[in-house]
Regions:
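Bacterial Sec-dependent N-terminal signal peptides
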Residues: 1-25
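Residue-level detector of conserved, function-critical positions
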Residues: 22-168
């Protein structure tokens, strides 16, 4: 595992050195290292840049499935309303809506985000907030449109409460 990680780090160093004069800080790549042999959801994680410098230390976030971060990545923070989305500098951007046991899927280049008040909006895959959180619930984009509502409530679809829908 350590050899594979070393190869991945060397690959990043060589590929980021060939950016045709573009600023490397704009294209920083972070690689995840976990406290477990294999990355496991929720395990302690740190992120190193292509030079091997620690950008995000162990303990700040837990592993959320992003083993490489070019623009944005998803990590887990205890007691937050979803997946935390960070940039390649380790800065928190926003929370991502949880869907199907993970961060929301990208539909038409956008995914759903939530704020501390549990209002929803949309962001793109570069970490730009495209539509500020302002809705009680939003459905993913389809054919250039998304259904949104300012009112309503979650309703369980089964006896276990694992699956739910939104009624407004």
């Amino acid at each position: 595992m350590k050899i594979k990680s070393l190869y991945a780090l060397l690959f990043c160093i060589f590929t980021t050195g060939c950016l045709d004069g573009q600023k490397q800080s704009d294209h920083a790549i972070l690689i995840a290292y976990t406290s477990t042999e294999f990355p496991e959801l929720g395990s302690s994680v740190c992120y190193l840049n292509e030079r091997g410098d620690t950008v995000i230390p162990f303990g700040k976030y837990h592993y959320g499935g992003s083993d490489t971060i070019r623009h944005i990545g998803f990590v887990v923070e205890p007691h937050t309303p979803g997946w935390t989305t960070i940039n390649n500098k380790g800065e928190k951007l926003f929370y991502t809506f949880s869907f199907d046991n993970g961060p929301d899927y990208v539909e038409e280049g956008l995914f759903r985000i939530i704020n501390d008040e549990m209002l929803m909006g949309f962001a793109d895959t570069l970490g730009n907030v495209v539509i500020q959180p302002q809705f009680a619930f939003v459905f993913p984009f389809k054919d250039g449109k998304a259904e949104v509502t300012y009112t309503g409530a979650k309703k369980a679809m089964d006896d276990y409460g694992e699956h739910w829908t939104w009624q407004s």
